[in-house]
Amino acid sequence: MNLIEFPLLDQTSSNSVISTTPNDLSNWSRLSSLWPLLYGTSCCFIEFASLIGSRFDFDRYGLVPRSSPRQADLILTAGTVTMKMAPSLVRLYEQMPEPKYVIAMGACTITGGMFSTDSYSTVRGVDKLIPVDVYLPGCPPKPEAVIDALTKLRKKISREIVEDRTRSQNKNRCFTTSHKLYVRRSTHTGTYEQELLYQSPSTLDISSETFFKSKSPVPSYKLVN
């Protein structure tokens, strides 16, 4: 029996009969056989690859990596996500069957990391594209931290009511019972916050009279506008 506690699995009789509910039985079977889709784009994924070895042995958690999103119920994003990759990531997530879960691994996936400071093509957080269940910070996180994130996800699944999760996601795709995200606009695919980015004006957009009028001070915003 799994070590994760269930509210109704500890009710046993003298005949060693376990009384439970279909929901708890479904949660127990799902948390013991997570099939992840590995979406690694950067160095954080190397730390997850070390779990495959005999030292950490992630097979004991029932993890079976899959190459198809239609056979996976967990997607693990590790590394930087760019705007050009955003449509592919959203499509992979939408092709996964319900119930499905997301683990964001590393600073670059959670906030954009160091590439988000001066990059125009980096998505500032994968949770702007798909709902995230477990955040795993670090640059990069250690394999022990990945195991801890998997344990937290398993505990979340054990206390989950499938009907509530399905009902909430049908109403709003980026809304879960764990973190209440309210979408203000549609999914960002390639044009994420383009209106907030500064683009230096070209000399062709500035008239010659304004450009060569150096004697009178002209504010920079007038040159742009």
From Swiss-Prot:
It catalyses: a plastoquinone + NADH + (n+1) H(+)(in) = a plastoquinol + NAD(+) + n H(+)(out); a plastoquinone + NADPH + (n+1) H(+)(in) = a plastoquinol + NADP(+) + n H(+)(out). Signal peptide: none annotated. Its cofactor is [4Fe-4S] cluster. It comes from the Eukaryota. It is found in: Plastid, Chloroplast thylakoid membrane. This is NAD(P)H-quinone oxidoreductase subunit K, chloroplastic. Binds 1 [4Fe-4S] cluster. Its EC number is 7.1.1.-. GO terms for cellular component: chloroplast thylakoid membrane; respiratory chain complex I. [4Fe-4S] cluster binds at residues 43-44, 108, 139. It is a peripheral membrane protein. HAMAP family: NDH1_NuoB (MF_01356). Pfam families: Oxidored_q6. Belongs to the complex I 20 kDa subunit family. NDH shuttles electrons from NAD(P)H:plastoquinone, via FMN and iron-sulfur (Fe-S) centers, to quinones in the photosynthetic chain and possibly in a chloroplast respiratory chain. The immediate electron acceptor for the enzyme in this species is believed to be plastoquinone. Couples the redox reaction to proton translocation, and thus conserves the redox energy in a proton gradient. NDH is composed of at least 16 different subunits, 5 of which are encoded in the nucleus. Keywords: 4Fe-4S, Chloroplast, Iron, Iron-sulfur, Membrane, Metal-binding, NAD, NADP, Plastid, Plastoquinone, Quinone, Thylakoid, Translocase, Transport. GO terms for molecular function: 4 iron, 4 sulfur cluster binding; iron ion binding; NADH dehydrogenase (ubiquinone) activity; quinone binding. One of its GO terms (biological process) is aerobic respiration. SUPFAM superfamilies: HydA/Nqo6-like. Its main location: plastid. It comes from Agrostis stolonifera (Creeping bentgrass).
